[in-house]
């Protein structure tokens, strides 16, 4: 005997578990909870009355007891007055007015009108064994389902029943008993909703035709579904041949409903899940939820605006999905992320596309803001040429510039090398020329490259007594790459060993052919020391400038390049700016690299204060928030807010770049490094007097890195060596290099206390050489085997406490006591270890030379045989060179 659980039966009937448990209790079946099992017999008891009720959806209110009692009367009414019902249909309006008040009257009418002859027979046949039980049971259940909110739905049934005013009086005495039933059937219809399929039995539905006419005019929205049930019954009745105008008119309408709405009802209600109006409503709600999830938002709502980066959680929130879905999608892409993981624009775009969204980057477009608008031809005016002096170390670049400026700046140079770029103004015959002085050492390649980019003309200084050198070639290459015309100044022609013709010959190999030899390169032979041909050199510069037609717009916002930057103790960050277009004024806001500021003061190359700087004019600017890098583009902006925003964005990008460089090794990478050999690191902190020198030293040190040892410049800045630098060196086990700077007193004391190595230099050669030596000291020494000698075993002796002793003859070299030895048997190594003792006759000896016999014992090894060969060797440690 199969059993069904309470909750399963409740789902099938389309009612709540509690309601079903109440019904079961009413028929005498005790259940403890919704998981309790019910026998089929109990289920039949429970569902038997429902079957009778569901046969006619409209007339649920009729009690089986009444039907049985009035069976004969009903037959009489149904047969005698079918026509009267149709005739009395018009008075419906009168009854409708009374619907609200006398509910009992309505019920009485229903009870009388409902029973049909066939229905009575069916009821008696099915339910005669226990007639009273279903009635009582139904009364209780309906009582439990009373819901005040459903009162409005009682109106349609009342209106239909009102069509039989003649029958109502006969049931008047029973009103009190029917009163509760009047309200309950309205609420009871929800679970009884699925009746249509079962209602297909013609016998049970034959009683409905009398109410066809009243139903049509009703237009109460909440009861739309209930009216459809009534129509279904009427249609069947009409088919059975019932008479009356109502029965004739409705069949067509009922036929349409049966083919369309009824099929839809099957799809919507029966297929998705449990039956019942209540359940149907629940199913509809669920389906609406699903549609909401699948629904694609409008195109404008599918665009998510982000600025540079966005976290996983924020992106999920804006797309209206769970963060776990995004994390799962990232994992499929090979990215392990958390809810707070930042996503760049590209990654966010990939994710959003997968979920049907678009990403719009609303970050500030720095390039667009800083882009310079083209100038009108009428706004352009002539500007002075910017001339860069380039050449090899100590070929006289600074001497030449000194001679031109008539100022002695050479005394401030260490080792004959210009330590940083200087920018100067020179006036000749009322026309100005701006000079940039670049260092000659190869470490300053980047600075020379920057100098070539901002310059109009390059003066290549070559010593007549030295000729073309490596830095000379680099200068030529930089100038050609920048497309800058070159004027060659052959310096030091006053020296007896000067050979200007040789210089021309060597430069011709580099593609610089003198005009005298049919080329287009201007050569001027000068002497900076004796001031020979200097005016001629300047005239050639101005002539070349005229050919280039150099022009700029002085009326626009200033734009230029940071030539040099340093941290001044009294003035803070100071930078030399070469204005290339526009005019820079005191009070202007600006941005340069990751720093911004406001021009608080400006000085020219002579130290005089100036209020403005036009095109091609160098000026020392005070007002930076930090020390910018040499070569950064300097742009004047309208307000501080914009400058600050651009600087902060650049700082963020710089941080991301730095983090990408210093990523931690994964376990797999670490294992690979261990397999390949341990990599050693040397950490260095560089401090200097000017930014250009710091950059040059740092770049030179980075070039010393090899596969075996890695040099990391963990910090490089301008200014004196401070306690912060020492603390950083302590934490990272670094060496501090000071270039033209000294440590503070407290920093010096802290360095001595912590044991931090602080090196101070004035010339870059010394710094590079010392670091190179330090790196060599970090490398493991190379182990090399040195052969000492070979001896043949000719006899073996067993000596107490010493084991087996080999009587040997030295074949070549010498056998040395305590040396490393190998024992070879048929040229196969059978032992490698240390010599325990070496004796000649009975005396211990230091060594035994070729051609002599000796006794040799091996450490912890006695398996010695005649004919074996003993090789002696030692391991030498050789320092590794970079």
Curated annotation (Swiss-Prot):
Assigned GO CC terms: cytosol
Any GO molecular function: GTPase activity
Binding-site positions, GTP: 391-398, 437-441, 491-494
Top-rank lineage group of the source organism: Bacteria
Keywords, sorted A to Z: Cytoplasm, GTP-binding, Initiation factor, Nucleotide-binding, Protein biosynthesis
Annotated spans, G1: 391-398
Purpose: One of the essential components for the initiation of protein synthesis. Protects formylmethionyl-tRNA from spontaneous hydrolysis and promotes its binding to the 30S ribosomal subunits. Also involved in the hydrolysis of GTP during the formation of the 70S ribosomal complex.
Record's protein name: Translation initiation factor IF-2
Organism ancestry: Bacteria, Pseudomonadati, Thermodesulfobacteriota, Desulfuromonadia, Geobacterales
